[in-house]
Swiss-Prot record:
It comes from the Bacteria. Zn(2+) 1 binds at residues 60, 62, 75, 78. GO terms for cellular component: DNA-directed RNA polymerase complex. This is DNA-directed RNA polymerase subunit beta'. It catalyses: RNA(n) + a ribonucleoside 5'-triphosphate = RNA(n+1) + diphosphate. NCBIfam families: rpoC_TIGR (TIGR02386). Its cofactor is Mg(2+); Zn(2+).
């Protein structure tokens, strides 16, 4: 057996007739498949056992030899070799064609490879191949030219005139003869000469021809092999025929297609033997050609061959193409054993690293392990009896199962898996029932809820797989979100509400002002009803044994509440005591104002003070992030579990409910509405008098109603009782927000019509009062559009993720340091005056490229090549520095990936990135996963001259595909001054920019908004009008750096507008992949052809070689490719073919004789090799896991 992990590379090429015959185990001569009576394969037919091997293991066709002992014997009666039946999956046959046939991929593809080799147009080729015209193959001494086309009539005339002194023929044989006559070296040499002088269209054609001829020359493929003499027949198990219940047969379409080929081939042989008239033979040859075309790629030329019910038959090409094709269905998406799925329910009592597995499911999943253990313990004599015991569910089986699943993590996955947190490992605990129990805190990462979601379970089998699951994938390890490095396991809903309720303060609650000696005493008083959870009390600070208190503070009384005492119990002892939800308290220490000297009148102090707000969801997030920063994973996951338990416990105790009476309607609502109506009437009067335009009237009416709604919202929020359950829910961040509340109690406000334009009649009622029929009808537009949009968006966002993954899948951290001398100058990303991404956010987790000094004191804040942490970043900001040179993926020199220093911190762990991390995939997931949160609509911005500027998901696609944007801005191509802005006759602006050398004028449409004025200095690439810049134009006018910055800024802008934070480095990885190619302009003395796309590294290699040999190097310009284009241009043909345009990619690769070096992840998944990332890298290959018996406390955080 081939060891897949020993592969160096994979090569594809054209097969010669000899090669096809050498693969074959025999010739298929008959179109028959199987005998309908005996159901055995017919001899010499498409399923023949003599050619393809026996249908039953170790049994020949006639039954003379049965049993393993005859292994390898060839039966003397039927000629079948006695062997395993699975050879029918690998043995090929062949058909000897009676006439050569052209291969449709090479003749019909775009560009036609055959046409380029022969320098004939595809139309001319088609006429020859399908027997419509003759082609001159050898003009002899006649005035005819080689490759000249002759119609039937002309051919006859020339035959009469010149007799046999020239040769012309039709069909694929003629083409084959022409292909055989080609001298590649000579042809290439003449073309290179012509290229020196050629211009325009002719030059482009020569370059294209040169490319194809060079590929043939260097790959060792013979152009004549594009015409087939022998047709391979694929193994029968790959085109099976199965019997259905009713005695009928279902068969693969390929068998029909092969049958047609064999039938026509045999008929042609017979006609040739009979010496039939030329016209009949030609017709039969044409039909054979068409049959082979249909077999290879049905429907590529003319109407597809159809089966019953007018369904086009699936040919060999269709077997590879598309989502259901071989690549995506079977090679990239395999089904796996040892897996199961079930509905999920919440498991509130689980630990962070646990999940509940239903007993019956666990028994089935761990069956082999349980059987082994049963035999080892002597509870069963052999494997068979062990299996029987399990099937009959003996009581002792459960005890064994309990022991087997200890320490054996399982993987849980929820579809759609949008990012790496969609698959995590848990330690299973057995539960009754048939539902999987899931820890509530991991729901956010999975985006799971318990309304009927299902999840899949997978069992890692080998010791290595288990170790990886435990060390890398355990849910307790995945606390941070890879896209921004913020905790993803924040409590939600009930847990937030419980902790909010727990940390509330209330005036005049029972027991206010009591002083306790320690926590136990306070809790005793609380449990016995002497003091309320929300009462402000004092406690002896020293008794809390908090390590952040100073000695003076320890001698004082701490002003707090019972609830906060309980809350602080869950935090590590060396963490500040959190008494107020402020950053100073969480990141620094408890403020001094809460410490009272002993002997002070506590009640008086309390009366003087404001109430401290309770801890909301955001604050809990901050606490988790800070605990993680200081104490790392184990401590954080323990604390999260405790926070979850507290939350559930106290939201239960709080008994917070909702009733209609909680929705209080605002008394002054009518007043506000009447006021707004009066304003609207005034606007209408102005419009009727012609003082304002219709558009202005519309804008003003909308703004009046919006203002009215905002006013109602403000009043409502102010008038609400702080203990109103609905207010508590929305304020804590558990559920709902102010706008939901306004719609319940205030007014619903303005709605949009199906086209997205706002209807100027607002909905004045609230849900509490009830809507009128018209109001209800208006509101249905928005609701329906929302649902339709969501459905469309999911598909679009998924496709974007797929393209992103494809373009970046081979970006892996390959080395420690690439030694680059470049970096990028990081400033805050701004859009006009608005800051999109702050400077500190861009700096954290990066390496400095140059040493940063304090501008005043001159002391070193961070040295060159040192990691910038949160604290250093804050120092840089405090020092007033606005720009810093940092290492960036953009400037990384590593081939096929990035280096540790240029990438910086791994957002998912908060540590340095490891060599082997698949950062490309992480980047793709981080950008794709929030895609569903982005809006679909194109906004109408601005007043009358409002042009559509794409936003949301379509804008992200536009940027990554490097398309010409909608609402394109005009940019200046030179540095200079705007000397004039004129209006032309046809209502356009003409902007004239003048530099010292030249003057350029730009035309902008009349409704464009200008961004410059006369006399202003502009730089190359600066926008003259508002709108989106075309990145390709920017690259042409300026340089790579400005394009990188522009794309980074624009993508960030879209995501930040929706409140999604993504780390810069993910977008940088993508943009770098879009800019990795250059187009050769002048080849110099090198072998590259002008106009070809080369990888930047290949280009530098070629030039370095030329300079070493003293030749003139080539010149090239950088190109920006969209992500689809960039994925198809990758060096790996396996990766490109499994992405899109499969046939085109494979045709091209075969002619070039491409080698796939298997550097990316996708190629390795396809051939079944370990991926060269993470633990699959060569450097980790030889690490063997050692099993040591360990106690539970070694591996799992215990409580």
């Amino acid at each position: 057996m081939l060891d897949v992990n020993k592969f160096e590379y994979m090569k594809i090429g054209l097969a010669s007739p000899e090669k096809i015959r050498s693969w074959s185990y025999g010739e298929v001569k008959k179109p028959e498949t199987i005998n309908y009576r005996t159901l055995k394969p017919e001899k010499d037919g498409l399923f023949c056992e003599r050619i393809f091997g026996p249908t039953k293991d170790w049994e020949c066709h006639c039954g003379k030899y049965k049993r393993v002992r005859y292994k390898g014997v060839v039966c003397d009666r039927c000629g079948v070799e006695v062997t395993r039946s699975k050879v029918r999956r690998e043995r090929m046959g062949h058909i000897e064609l009676a006439a050569p046939v052209s291969h449709i991929w090479y003749f019909k593809g775009i560009p036609s490879r055959m046409g380029l080799v022969l320098d004939m147009s595809p139309r001319a080729l088609e006429e020859v191949i399908y027997f419509a015209s003759y082609v001159v193959t050898d003009p002899g001494d006649t005035p005819l030219e080689k490759k000249q086309l002759l119609s039937e009539k002309e051919y006859r005339a020339y035959r009469e005139k010149y007799g046999q002194s020239f040769q012309a023929s039709m069909g694929a044989e003629a083409i084959k003869k022409l292909l055989q006559d080609i001298d590649l070296d000579k042809e290439v040499a003449t073309l290179k000469e012509e290229l020196k002088t050629a211009q325009g269209q002719r030059r482009a054609r020569i370059i294209k021809r040169l490319e194809v001829l060079e590929s043939f020359r260097s790959s060792g493929n013979d152009p004549a092999w594009m015409v087939l003499d022998v047709l391979p027949v694929i193994p029968p198990e790959l085109r099976p025929m199965v019997q259905l219940d009713g005695g009928r047969f279902a068969t693969s379409d390929l068998n029909d297609l092969y049958r047609r080929v064999i039938n026509r081939n045999n008929r042609l042989k017979r006609l040739l033997d009979l010496g039939a008239p030329n016209i009949i033979v030609q017709n039969e040859k044409r039909m054979l050609q068409e049959a082979v075309d249909a077999l290879i790629d049905n429907g590529r030329r003319g109407r597809p061959v159809t089966g019953p019910g007018n369904r086009p038959l699936k040919s060999l090409s269709h077997m590879l193409k598309g989502k259901q094709g071989r690549f995506r269905q079977n090679l990239l998406g395999k089904r796996v054993d040892y897996s199961g799925r079930s509905v999920i329910v919440v498991g509130p009592n689980l630990k962070m690293y646990q999940c509940g597995l239903p007993k019956e499911m666990a028994l089935e999943l761990f069956k082999p392990f349980v059987m082994k253990e049963l035999v080892e313990r002597g509870l069963a004599h052999n494997i068979k009896s062990a299996k029987r015991k399990i099937e009959r569910v003996h009581p002792e089986v459960w005890d064994v199962l309990e022991d087997v699943i200890k320490e054996h993590p399982v993987l849980l996955n929820r579809a759609p898996t949008l990012h790496r947190l969609g698959i995590q490992a848990f330690e299973p605990t057995l539960v009754e029932g048939r539902a999987i129990r899931l820890h509530p805190l991991v729901c956010t990462a999975y985006n799971a809820d318990f309304d009927g979601d299902q999840m899949a379970v997978h069992v890692p089998l080998s010791a290595e797989a288990q170790a990886e699951a435990r060390l890398l994938m355990l849910a307790a390890q995945n606390i941070l979100n890879p896209k921004d490095g913020k905790p993803v396991v924040t409590p939600s809903q009930d847990m937030v509400l419980g902790n909010y309720y727990l940390t509330m303060e209330r005036e005049g609650a029972i027991g206010e002002g009591m002083v306790f000696k320690d926590t136990d005493e306070a809790l005793l008083a609380y449990h016995n009803g002497y003091v309320h959870l929300h009462s402000r009390i004092a406690i002896h600070a020293g008794s809390l044994k908090n390590e952040t208190f100073t000695p003076e503070q320890n001698n004082k009384l701490l002003l707090t509440t019972v609830g906060k005492l309980i809350f602080n119990e869950i935090l590590p002892k060396s963490f500040p005591y959190i008494n107020e939800p402020t950053t100073e308290n969480i990141e620094g220490r408890t403020p001094d104002k809460y410490f009272l000297d002993k002997g002070v009148d506590v009640r008086e102090e309390i009366r003087k003070r404001e109430l401290v707000p309770p801890f909301k969801k955001k604050v809990l997030g901050q606490i988790i992030a800070e605990v993680f920063k200081r104490f790392k994973i184990t401590e954080t996951s323990k604390m999260l579990d405790r926070m979850k338990d507290l939350g559930f416990q106290y939201s239960t105790k709080a008994g917070i409910t909702i009733g209609v009476s909680d929705i209080v309607v605002l008394p002054e609502k009518q007043e506000i509405l009447d006021e707004a109506q009066a304003k609207v009437d005034t606007v209408l009067k102005q419009f009727r008098r012609g003082l304002i335009t219709d558009e202005e009237r519309y804008e003003r009416v909308i703004s009046v109603w919006s203002a009215a709604k905002d006013k109602i919202q403000d009043r409502l929020m102010k008038s609400l009782d702080k203990r109103n359950p609905i207010f508590m829910m929305s304020d804590s961040g558990a559920r709902g927000n102010a706008s939901n509340f306004t719609q319940l109690a205030g007014m619903r406000g303005l709605m949009a019509n199906p086209a997205g334009r706002i209807i100027e009649l607002p909905i004045k009622s609230s849900f509490r009062e009830g809507l009128t029929v018209l109001e209800y009808f208006i509101s249905t537009h928005g609701a329906r559009k929302g649902l339709a949009d969501t459905a469309l968006k999911t598909a679009d966002s998924g496709y974007l993720t797929r393209r992103l993954v494809d373009v970046a899948q081979d970006v892996i951290v390959r080395e420690e340091d690439c030694g680059t001398d470049r970096g990028i100058l990081a400033r805050a990303l701004t859009d006009g005056t608005e800051v999109v991404v702050k400077l500190e956010e861009r700096l954290v987790g990066r390496y400095a490229h140059k040493t940063v000094h304090h501008p005043e004191t001159g002391e070193v804040i961070v040295r060159k090549d040192e990691m910038i942490t949160e604290d250093i970043a804050n120092e840089i900001i405090k020092a007033g520095i606005t720009e810093v040179w940092i290492r960036s993926v953009f400037a990384c020199n590593t081939r096929h990936g990035v280096c540790k220093k240029c990438y910086g911190r791994n957002m998912a762990t908060g540590m340095d990135v490891e060599v082997g991390e698949a950062v490309g995939i992480i980047a793709a997931q981080s950008i794709g996963e929030p895609g569903t949160q982005l809006t679909m609509r194109t906004f109408h911005t601005g007043g009358v001259a409002g042009d559509d500027i794409t936003q949301g998901l379509p804008r992200v696609q536009e940027l990554f595909e490097a398309r010409n944007p909608k609402g394109q801005a005009v940019i200046s191509e030179i540095d200079g001054t705007v000397v004039a802005i004129n209006e032309t006759r046809d209502n356009q602006y003409e902007i004239v920019v003048q530099s010292e050398v030249e003057t350029r004028s730009y035309v902008a449409p009349y409704n464009a908004r200008l961004k410059v004025e006369e006399g202003q200095h502009v730089e190359r690439g600066q926008e003259l009008t508002e709108g989106s810049v075309d990145p390709k134009q920017l690259l042409r006018v300026r340089d790579i750096t400005s394009v990188q910055e522009y794309l980074l800024r624009e993508v960030q802008k879209v995501y930040r507008m929706q409140g999604v934070e993504i780390s810069d480095k993910h977008i940088e990885v993508m943009v770098r992949q879009m800019l990795r190619k250059v187009r050769v302009i002048d080849a110099g003395d090198t072998d590259v052809l002008p106009g070809t796309l080369l990888d930047v590294h290949q280009f530098t290699d070629v030039n370095a070689q030329a300079i070493r040999e003293g030749k003139r190097p080539a010149t090239a310009r950088p190109v920006l490719l969209g992500i689809t284009k960039a994925s198809l241009e990758t060096d790996s043909f396996l990766s490109a073919a499994s992405f899109q345009e499969t046939t085109r990619v494979l045709t091209d690769a075969a002619i070039k004789g491409k080698r796939d070096e298997l550097l990316g992840l996708k190629e390795n998944v396809i051939i079944g090799k370990l991926v060269p990332a993470g633990t699959g890298m060569a450097r980790y290959r030889n690490v063997k896991p050692a099993v040591k018996k360990e106690t539970a406390s070694d591996t799992v955080p215990s409580n």
